[in-house]
C-alpha cells in the first residue's frame, strides 16, 4: 500500500468560467469525475472507465454525488484533486475528494458508483481484482 496520496491536476481555463469569473458550478462535478477516472487509470494499468466498459464489460454508474463548496475555483491556479476510495461495498465503491487551488481547499466530495455488467446493465459484485487493489487504499474522509 502506498502512503502517497493520488492527486490529479486539472487545468481550469477561461472557458470553464461563468460571468462571475469563477468556474461554472456544473464544471466542478466534471472535474471531480475526471479525477476519479484518472484514479482508475493510475491504479489499473491505464484502464479507466472507457476500457472497463468496452473491454471488461464492467460499468460503474454513479448512484450518489455529494459536494461541499468551500472556495471559488478560478483559472488562476491549477486545481489539485486528491482522490481516494473511502468504502468498498459488496457491489459499490465510494470515492472521497479534496480539491485545492494554491493550497486553499475549494471543495470536498463523496461519489458512489455501483458495479454493473455493462451489456445487460445489471448490478454485480465488485470483482476480486478490483478488491485486491482498492481494499488496502481505503481511508476515511
Locate each region found by the language model.
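Hot-dog-fold acyl-thioester-processing enzymes
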Residues: 2-62, 118-141
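HotDog/MaoC-like acyl-thioester-processing domains
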Residues: 3, 7, 74-78, 86-141
Amino acid at each position: 500500500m502506498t502512503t502517497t496520496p493520488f492527486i490529479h491536476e486539472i487545468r481550469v481555463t477561461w472557458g470553464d468560467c461563468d460571468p462571475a469569473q469563477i468556474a461554472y458550478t456544473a464544471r466542478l462535478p466534471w472535474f471531480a469525475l475526471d479525477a476519479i477516472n484518472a484514479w482508475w487509470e493510475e491504479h489499473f494499468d491505464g484502464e479507466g472507465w472507457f476500457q472497463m466498459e468496452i473491454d471488461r464489460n464492467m460499468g460503474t454508474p454513479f448512484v450518489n454525488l455529494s459536494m461541499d463548496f468551500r472556495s471559488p475555483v478560478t483559472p488562476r491556479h491549477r486545481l489539485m484533486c486528491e482522490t481516494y476510495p473511502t468504502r468498498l461495498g459488496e457491489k459499490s465503491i465510494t470515492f472521497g475528494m479534496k480539491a485545492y487551488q494554491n493550497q486553499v481547499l475549494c471543495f470536498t466530495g463523496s461519489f458512489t458508483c455501483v458495479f454493473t455488467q455493462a451489456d445487460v446493465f445489471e448490478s454485480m459484485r465488485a470483482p476480486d481484482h478490483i478488491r485486491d487493489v482498492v481494499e488496502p487504499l481505503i481511508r476515511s474522509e
